[in-house]
Amino acid sequence: MACLLETPIRMSVLSEVTASSRHYVDRLFDPDPQKVLQGVIDMKNAVIGNNKQKANLIVLGAVPRLLYLLQQETSSTELKTECAVVLGSLAMGTENNVKSLLDCHIIPALLQGLLSPDLKFIEACLRCLRTIFTSPVTPEELLYTDATVIPHLMALLSRSRYTQEYICQIFSHCCKGPDHQTILFNHGAVQNIAHLLTSVSYKVRMQALKCFSVLAFENPQVSMTLVNVLVDGELLPQIFVKMLQRDKPIEMQLTSAKCLTYMCRAGAIRTDDNCIVLKTLPCLVRMCSKERLLEERVEGAETLAYLIEPDVELQRIASITDHLIAMLADYFKYPSSVSAITDIKRLDHDLKHAHELRQAAFKLYASLGANDEDIRKKIIDTENMMDRIVTGLSESSVKVRLAAVRCLHSLSRSVQQLRTSFQDHAVWKPLMKVLQNAPDEILVVASSMLCNLLLEFSPSKEPILESGAVELLCGLTQSENPALRVNGIWALMNMAFQAEQKIKADILRSLSTEQLFRLLSDSDLNVLMKTLGLLRNLLSTRPHIDKIMSTHGKQIMQAVTLILEGEHNIEVKEQTLCILANIADGTTAKELIMTNDDILQKIKYYMGHSHVKLQLAAMFCISNLVWNEEEGSQERQDKLRDMGIVDILHKLSQSPDSNLCDKAKTALQQYLA
């Protein structure tokens, strides 16, 4: 019986809940406009801070009716305004509420409302639009669908401090990427918003500042314009510097520092400018201190990482400012150990930000250690740092894993660290694990780091080889992603450098000649260059050259011919001629050149090329072919003389280029010996 009773009970509870809300909706349909207005006002009071009531009213169909009243010409301005206020309140509930409002096409209705002459109604519409556009479920594109909207919003900026605050907030949330920046810039965003930085309202100043930070991000055009904008006789960068002084609210300091950082990275402010070195950088380091809130520390560290990323001098200055390297170690101490039950809220907060803190610290360490050996050593010597980074490689959060890999990659540029810390912590093990199964963005950085670990002086090279790296890297060369193809082939190139014959044979077997030749015709120049580099490293030391050419000679000569005939740049042709020079150094392999008249004619052609690099590379081929201490040298010399090579050598021995001149003289001596 209990089962039978259960449903009616649930239904009665539901009907009770909806009944208490239904009368609010019913009153919206009253024929008396005064009663409708009072109904909307009562609804407004009922939903404030009550998410359950908001959800009920949405389910009962309040939104379409409110939108209808908002758009009716016969509705009084007061009624329209109250409708906009209620809709704004509903939007402040859950994300599902916002989705429901979007489904009812609330944005076009509110944008239409902005054409009203009544300021209070306009402000209510803007406040509601602000709430909807700042929700993560709202597509930013909805602001740009109608081309008349942005210019109209620009015109409304002068109406009141509320229109200024809401419109700037809408712009800063909906400006995502260069297309949006261009639209706002072309409609006069810089000129219309600049003077708001001196508004008496803190909220207006703050929202205007946020607008400039999103407009300037990675945008040279906007940044170059901002540098020269005057507001009340003061240049914008000077205003931003004033806003990042210690006596200003933290939010303002951080956002001003972002504006100056983005302008600097976009090339509008020099990295050695005082406003960067003496103001922006110290402000961002301050934001990383223990005194700041966790979210401020995250934002401070990430912005600082971005500011110093390309500049070694800023990296050095940051590394010795306020013990920054040691200060960042504290980012890994969250969540803190909780003793009292009263700290549960604190624990929840710490947990929420722990991932972000670790990610920010890794990013900043990566930027700090990008170039300077001493800074890298300081980072690695910081308490348990290598352990923390290695742990970061297996974090559940993709963003933390990516930041940890980037940090390791930055530190792996150090020969000293590759030989010591990286070996002590067997970094290659977790790295190989990361490479087995990770999103492309992580794979790109991890495989790039593997290239460093496979350099000939790295002690990690041997164990990496033994753990199946060849197959893994050959797999990467088949990726759709050009960056992964480059890194895969680059790592194989490093692996093949001065390697034993067995390793070279493993590479050729795993890669397959078909794939090797696919890579030699890759549209990506970097892939082609690294593949040629791999081939050059495979074809080094005579026994290896002869062995490889005895099995793959025909295909390799074919590939070389195609590249020398193709429309390739100087570097590609030079690398290809160097491969030929290596083949010419083989004992039996050189016969593959001597019996190929087409290749010999190409070498002759490049000896007379206008570019010295190509002449030199062709000369290496000739020197190796005519060297008289080797068997068959007389026949080779005779054949090359008949082709006119000796005449070219005489001509080159008079070359103004000392290298070329010396090489030609050395080759001629082989004929005289």
Curated annotation (Swiss-Prot):
Pfam family, one: Arm
ARM repeat feature ranges: 51-92, 95-134, 138-176, 178-217, 224-265, 269-309, 313-352, 374-413, 416-455, 458-497, 501-540, 543-585, 588-627, 634-673
GO cellular component, one term: GID complex
Matches recorded under InterPro entries: ARM-like, ARM-type_fold, Armadillo, ARMC8/Vid28
SMART domains, per the entry: ARM
Main location: nucleus
Location in or out of the cell: Nucleus; Cytoplasm
Residues annotated with N-acetylalanine modification: A2
UniProt entry tagged with the keyword Thylakoid: no
Keywords: Acetylation, Cytoplasm, Nucleus, Phosphoprotein, Repeat
Domain of life assignment: Eukaryota
Gene Ontology BP terms: proteasome-mediated ubiquitin-dependent protein catabolic process
Signal in keyword set: no
PTM annotation (Phosphoserine): residues: S337, S512
Self-association state and partner proteins as the record states: Identified in the CTLH complex that contains GID4, RANBP9 and/or RANBP10, MKLN1, MAEA, RMND5A (or alternatively its paralog RMND5B), GID8, ARMC8, WDR26 and YPEL5. Within this complex, MAEA, RMND5A (or alternatively its paralog RMND5B), GID8, WDR26, and RANBP9 and/or RANBP10 form the catalytic core, while GID4, MKLN1, ARMC8 and YPEL5 have ancillary roles.
Function of the protein: Component of the CTLH E3 ubiquitin-protein ligase complex that selectively accepts ubiquitin from UBE2H and mediates ubiquitination and subsequent proteasomal degradation of the transcription factor HBP1.
Protein name: Armadillo repeat-containing protein 8
Chain's gene name: ARMC8
